[in-house]
Amino acid sequence: MSSDSFQRQLVQRTNTLNSSIDNATLTILSRFQDILDIAINEGKDKYTVAPEVYQIECHTVSMVRAVEQLLDVSRQIKSYWLTNSLSTSFPTVDYSEPDLEKVKRTLTKLQNHLLEVSLIEPEASETTEAPTVSDT
Amino acid sequence: MAEEANKDADISSLSLSLDPEIIGGQNNFLENNLQQIFQKIIQERGPFRDLKEEDLQKELQKESIKDESSAKSSETENVLEFATLDSKRNVNDTEVESMDSQAYKKELIEQIMIAQTECSLALDMTSLLLSKFKENSIETISPFLKSTVPPSSLQFSRSQPPESKESDATLAKCWKEKSLTSSCKFLFEAKERLTSVVETEHEYYTELVKVKEASWPLFNSQGSNHLSVQYSCLGGISLGLGLIRMKPESKSFEVQSSLLYSQAALKISILNKDRDEIGSSTWSWPSQNCNSVLLKDIYKLQEILFEMDIWNSLLQEAQSCGNQGVNFTGDEILVPISDDHVVRITLETSSKNTESGFTEDKKSNEDTSTNFVTIKQEKELLKCLCDTLNAIAHILFLKHCRKSDRRSQQPELYMAIDANAPLILRPLIFYYNLNQESLEFQRWLKQRDISFKFMPNYPWEKAKDFLELENSLSINRLSISWRIMVSNFEPAIFIQHTPTLHGTDKSVWRCKDQYSSNQFSSLKNVCQYIEHHINSLSRRSKKTE
């Protein structure tokens, strides 16, 4: 994905989330205001009050749904951060130098099992060159 | 059709009789009154609508024949024909009349019933309306209505809405109060529920942050609100995705995966000629220092998948090592290492610890202390060997997983071999064969009392970290130096052995003495060369003497 398209997608996602937040917030405020407006019974007969009872219940449910929508937005933001942010490192196997040296010694020991091993002598290379000089 | 029928009728009526008197009489009818003629025709032949042209034509033909025969026969036939026509007409009329009358009666009865119903209803309503003003009208009310509606109940009055009461305000207030109370209760319940949801999600995402801080990659799951973790990012070849979700029973988090086994570990055993296990090693990963249960589960899944992947890789490689004596089934891989011993590689999937180690016989109890020490040392050595083989297998598999490193550092190998082919068994076999070949050479030299110096130069000895160690184990070519002292007075023979893991030159022996430098492809040739050299020296010494 190119950086431009990624930026456009990021902007679009941001706008969508902001729009969701604004809508949910507006819903909560407007529904609360509506409940307060119809809470008073002065100058109303029972035939007018009856439908307002159901309106209050509907507004209450709408407020709760708006809050749930805000929680969903929060969940999306968290998931987006967890899944899309790049990691600077990767899980590694915990090795240490003593273990490395131990492994090396063990490998050498097993490889030289039942063998008579001599240390490499620096003089051996010099001795090797001597026959060449004599040949000359 | 009607006009034609009328014409035919006229013709037939004219041809009824050929007597002059009758013809004259008919002419008088025509002149006098045409209606009478029609009436006569109808009386004789029935309605015009029943007349058919074919029938009339037949009659004309018959009459022409009758005229030729006799008047009596013609009269008789005419009578019969009339009778036949009359009978037909009667039958048709009866059928038509009966059908029409039945349908008409049925329709008429339905209409009468509807009218009766309407009249009865009108009478009831009218009587009920007049019952207040006229006593006799009660008699005309139907019994059903009389029993259900009292007399004089239908009046000329309008209905008014009920008057408002003082309790209406109280009722409305109670309704509103109840509504507000229930809404308040609903909000508090929602608050409790959502608070619980937030707390749960807080714990969930806190655990996920720990997973992310441990550098495990996380992904969104399609069709689910939960996230998935890829637990094979380091050493596995498989995808290794697990869904992170909460257990409803214990309120803890788990990784839901689809692995076949709940526990897996590579096990390497050494078997003797009787197929008894004399040494074994079951791989175990070091414990992770983390407080999160979820992370522990992820590390465990990683280990299980790693072991399963390495086992699959070994099986894959065993298919191409048949020429080196490797046998395999779905459960085990057998690598012969000598005439009497076999290395067995299996995947241990049960939780039971089957690491048995050295198998002791009953006779071992009767051995002396020296034998006991020897057996113990042998046991430890076998254990060490199995552990090392297990470690090397894992290290080589890690290197196999790092494809990019292998491709970049050793391009010639990438071109020579399949990049996806694992390389685990072949290095192990290679180093074992190297040990055996060196051992054989030393034994041969000792048998002939030839002094030597064996100076191996293993690639891993210079490794500074584990990455270099991994690379060193897969180096294609080694270099081992030998120094053969054939005589105390003559210079030594220098031999450089360069075994090759891949390629056509499996093993190259370069021998150099004071007179020449030779190259051999097998140990046998090297031994022949040394013998030849010794013989040459002996012959030269004899000549000198």
Curated annotation (Swiss-Prot), chain A:
Keywords: Activator, Nucleus, Transcription, Transcription regulation
Single Gene Ontology MF annotation: transcription coactivator activity
Subcellular location: Nucleus
Cited Pfam families: Med22 (PF06179)
Domain of life: Eukaryota
Predominant location: nucleus
A GO term from the CC aspect: mediator complex
GO biological process: positive regulation of transcription initiation by RNA polymerase II; transcription initiation at RNA polymerase II promoter
Primary role: Component of the Mediator complex, a coactivator involved in the regulated transcription of nearly all RNA polymerase II-dependent genes. Mediator functions as a bridge to convey information from gene-specific regulatory proteins to the basal RNA polymerase II transcription machinery. Mediator is recruited to promoters by direct interactions with regulatory proteins and serves as a scaffold for the assembly of a functional preinitiation complex with RNA polymerase II and the general transcription factors.
Family stated for the protein in its record: Belongs to the Mediator complex subunit 22 family.
Subunit structure: Component of the Mediator complex.
Listed name of the protein: Mediator of RNA polymerase II transcription subunit 22
Species: Schizosaccharomyces pombe (strain 972 / ATCC 24843) (Fission yeast)
Curated annotation (Swiss-Prot), chain B:
Function: Component of the Mediator complex, a coactivator involved in the regulated transcription of nearly all RNA polymerase II-dependent genes. Mediator functions as a bridge to convey information from gene-specific regulatory proteins to the basal RNA polymerase II transcription machinery. Mediator is recruited to promoters by direct interactions with regulatory proteins and serves as a scaffold for the assembly of a functional preinitiation complex with RNA polymerase II and the general transcription factors.
Polar residues: compositionally biased ranges: 149-162
Quaternary context: Component of the Mediator complex. Interacts with med18, prk1 and rbp1.
BP-aspect Gene Ontology terms: positive regulation of transcription initiation by RNA polymerase II; regulation of transcription by RNA polymerase II; transcription initiation at RNA polymerase II promoter
Localization: Nucleus
Organism: Schizosaccharomyces pombe (strain 972 / ATCC 24843)
PANTHER family in the cross-refs: MEDIATOR OF RNA POLYMERASE II TRANSCRIPTION SUBUNIT 17 (PTHR13114:SF7)
Keyword terms, alphabetized: Activator, Nucleus, Transcription, Transcription regulation
Gene3D superfamilies, sorted: 3.90.1150.120, 6.10.250.2620, 6.10.250.2630
Chain residue ranges for the region called Disordered: 148-168
Disulfide bonds: none
Cellular-component GO terms for this entry: core mediator complex; mediator complex
Protein name according to UniProt: Mediator of RNA polymerase II transcription subunit 17
GO molecular function, one term: transcription coactivator activity
InterPro entries: Mediator_Med17
Main location: nucleus
Family: Belongs to the Mediator complex subunit 17 family.
